């Protein structure tokens, strides 16, 4: 086989590839329980992960999408648990409305305090973040300990986020942290089980920012079929 002539690169535009991917996702996913406002987030999570099981496991607080849109349009801060989430997020759409996306886990004072208390930087980063991001979006895709600490701070009345996107991946405390998040009164986006990660957290956050940037409004929660 002559590999020099066998391979022919695609010549379609990126938008065409994405559009075709979304069509395939909708067709393969079939009937689902998600509302019109929730579905774009699920669609982008599946698009990023190629994992329909993960997409079907998504859970939403009834006010999650509207809360996320409101936070972005109001210029609230977005807090990421790790740099990967920060780097992957479309900052232009966040900054357009006066917000910014910040990550605290590598701050020198966070590292020093974590060492002093013999705990994780993820935990200390959440304690710092809540002082600067009242009403903001917390996007956690890597560290279950960060999500568990944020949940504790919410329960104790120390944190009042506008939206929590909690999709950490892993075997230790990942599923459990998401179960606890789903019990809270604050708006959240999460999923059932161990799957998740920074890339799907970015997908969910970017989907929210696209909706916020588009000017879309939701007055109901009509179910898609």
Swiss-Prot record:
Assigned keywords, A-Z: Cobalamin biosynthesis, Isomerase
Q: Tell me the pathway.
A: Cofactor biosynthesis; adenosylcobalamin biosynthesis; cob(II)yrinate a,c-diamide from sirohydrochlorin (anaerobic route): step 9/10
GO annotation (BP), single: cobalamin biosynthetic process
Q: Which InterPro entries match?
A: Cbl_synth_CobH/CbiC, CobH/CbiC_sf
Matching entries from SUPFAM superfamilies are given as: Precorrin-8X methylmutase CbiC/CobH
Binding-site positions, substrate = 21, 44
Catalytic residues (positions): 47
Catalytic class of the enzyme: isomerase
What is the recorded function of this protein according to its Swiss-Prot or TrEMBL entry? Catalyzes the conversion of cobalt-precorrin-8 to cobyrinate.
The record's subunit annotation is:
Homodimer.
Q: Which family does it belong to?
A: Belongs to the CobH/CbiC family.
Protein name per the record: Cobalt-precorrin-8 methylmutase
Which gene carries the instructions for this protein? cbiC
